[in-house]
């Protein structure tokens, strides 16, 4: 793929890049989306759980997302009973109104992850950069990762990547 003279190509395919980036692995995450019109949460709520930190995020129309399981597996089969019970029980402990919620969706996906669970920037060819391994932190760390990538493009180094402890692979 050629983006034209002077252009950069950024590869942000997640696990789709695994054939070119062998260190990537998938970490299974499961999510429960429920409709609970009797529950009123205004902000995402993080929960401490024995196996992994969970969260409940309110969405418009009385919908809530309970998620953030992390299972060391690249299995994309349907959600397990154990994880589903953990997600729904966590919601119920936050508000008893979740006991009458309707399950809208149970989903499973894999998070692209590197050995240290931190994202990395990788120069794969002249003017080509792979950005990957965002693990559980995708939407939270993506703006800083973009800033680090742009520093690398503009200055050929990234003080921000160093400050954040991000790997820069040349």
Where are the regions that the model predicts?
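Generic beta-sheet signal
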Residues: 7-9, 64, 129
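Short hydrophobic core segments
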Residues: 5-15, 146
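C-terminal catalytic lobe of FAD-dependent flavoproteins
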Residues: 101-170
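Active-site substrate-recognition segment that forms the wall
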Residues: 12-125
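A conserved beta-strand/loop element that lines the FAD pocket in flavoprotein oxidoreductases
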Residues: 1
């Amino acid at each position: 793929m050629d983006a034209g003279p002077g252009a950069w190509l950024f590869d942000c395919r997640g696990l789709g890049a695994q054939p070119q980036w062998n260190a990537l692995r998938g970490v299974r995450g499961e999510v429960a989306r429920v409709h609970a019109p009797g529950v009123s949460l205004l902000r995402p709520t993080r929960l401490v759980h024995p196996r992994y930190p969970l969260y409940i995020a309110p969405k418009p129309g009385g919908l809530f997302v309970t998620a953030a399981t992390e299972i060391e597996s690249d299995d994309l089969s349907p959600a397990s009973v154990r994880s589903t019970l953990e997600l729904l029980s966590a919601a119920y402990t936050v508000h008893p109104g979740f006991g009458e919620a309707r399950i809208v969706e149970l989903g499973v996906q894999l998070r692209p992850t590197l050995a240290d669970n931190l994202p990395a920037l990788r120069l794969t060819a002249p003017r080509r950069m792979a950005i990957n391994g965002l693990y559980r932190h995708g939407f939270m760390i993506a703006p800083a990762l973009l800033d680090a990538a742009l520093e690398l493009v503009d200055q050929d180094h990234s003080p921000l990547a160093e400050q954040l402890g991000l790997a820069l692979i040349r």
